[in-house]
Amino acid sequence: MQAVGQLMLDIEGTALSLADEALLRQPEVGGVILFGRNVESPEQVRELTDSMRAIKPNILIAVDQEGGRVARLRAGFSPLPAMGKLGEKFEHDPITALDLAYCAGYLMASEVLAVGIDFSFAPVLDINGVSRVIGDRAFHAHPIAITALSAEFMRGMKLAGMATTGKHFPG
């Protein structure tokens, strides 16, 4: 039987267990997403990602590092504001807000890549104010502002060398 796709899974701790190692060796596993429970420091995350790649060199490693309350990498990493703060700035100073969005994307991607993580599921492209779950994770309530700010955030990510993954769907 031929596999149609690969799975992205998570692990429980800050280091690979024997069970994690066995699971990563399975051909169906193509990626791992890290959560806060997997993170102690940049050095520890680098050791973790290196250990994953020792088992499966081409594994994709991801994280949710949006800024604000959705930041799995905290200790030793630069805190970024919720993207809604950039939307607020956009209201009265769009040029600065766009520059800050670019810088935030670059900084986030640079730090994430430096510890061996391939990409962050960011930015959030939802419309601010539609969902309490999303809240200030979204840039703005107006699609034109969302488009402008997210384009700059993604431009920063790309300059750092990271692929972008806008979310959520259906949007």
Say what each PLM segment does.
Residues 16-29:
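N-terminal glycine-rich anion-binding loops that anchor highly charged ligand groups
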Residues 149-170:
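Phosphate/pyrophosphate-binding betaalpha-module
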Residues 1-16:
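Boundary/entry segment of secreted carbohydrate-active catalytic domains
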Residues 6, 60, 163:
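Hydrophobic "anchor" residues on beta-strands that sit immediately upstream
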Residues 28-48, 52-146, 168:
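Enzymes and membrane/adaptor proteins characterized by extended Gly/Ser/Thr/Asp/Glu-rich
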